[in-house]
């Protein structure tokens, strides 16, 4: 009750964090908050992806997680004393004096594909799950390319590194490619954009503006001289993420 009363006196209405560039990292932080029974609202994403109202019972915990403390009265402190949750996820955040409207977050966001294409598909390169997305397709024999130019399709901007999955020249049939993309899009929360032609905004999707991504061969060194914690962290990343 005291927490709630204190939150009503605050000049801030809540905290905004996250963006539409990296849905996965934004959601991971939101899911941690939900696990602690903190209310999180999913917004339209124009300014921030999520909004945390401060007028709730755990307002002090919320502030502790988002406060950026740089000065300490004591000369001795643990490294966790300076941890700020959103920075651990490389996310922007801001204490806001106005509320952001939206729906309370309940379930994990599922990625979507804009439709079937006979030409190809595009994926923006920002999301934390992009390596997983690429690996899944390469393990299924799908050839991918990466853009060396910025381009636009119907007011939708695509940055350097945008992924292209051409339909022509693949070992899989177009229907199978669409099925695989639909599957990994749902699992990773990454949106897939379907192409309606092979040429847009002065860029040809069969041109040298796109470079084929080679499947990597990765080795993990373990044993004497290697900290088991470091090796385990990388192993877990590759094995589960």
Regions found by a protein language model. Name each.
Residues 1-241:
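Intrinsic-disorder/low-complexity accessory segments
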């Amino acid at each position: 009750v005291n927490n709630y009363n204190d939150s009503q006196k605050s000049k801030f209405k809540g905290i905004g964090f996250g963006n539409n560039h990296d849905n996965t990292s934004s959601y991971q932080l939101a899911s941690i908050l939900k696990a602690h029974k903190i209310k999180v609202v999913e917004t339209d994403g124009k300014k921030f992806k999520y909004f945390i109202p401060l007028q709730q019972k755990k307002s002090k915990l919320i502030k502790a997680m988002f406060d950026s403390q740089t000065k300490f009265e004591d000369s001795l402190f643990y490294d966790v004393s300076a941890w700020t949750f959103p920075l651990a996820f490389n996310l922007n955040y801001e204490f806001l004096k106005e509320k952001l409207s939206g729906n309370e977050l309940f379930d994990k966001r599922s990625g979507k594909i804009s439709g079937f294409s006979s030409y190809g598909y595009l994926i923006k390169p920002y999301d934390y799950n992009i390596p997983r997305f690429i690996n899944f397709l390469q393990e299924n024999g799908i050839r991918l390319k990466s853009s060396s130019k910025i381009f636009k399709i119907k007011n939708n901007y695509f940055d350097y590194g945008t992924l292209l999955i051409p339909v022509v020249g693949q070992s899989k049939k177009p229907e199978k490619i669409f099925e695989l993309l639909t599957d990994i899009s749902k699992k990773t929360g990454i949106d897939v954009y379907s192409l309606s032609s092979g040429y847009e905004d002065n860029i040809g999707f069969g041109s040298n503006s796109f470079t084929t991504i080679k499947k990597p061969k990765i080795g993990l060194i373990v044993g004497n001289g290697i900290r088991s914690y470091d090796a385990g962290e990388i192993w877990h990343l590759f094995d589960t993420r």
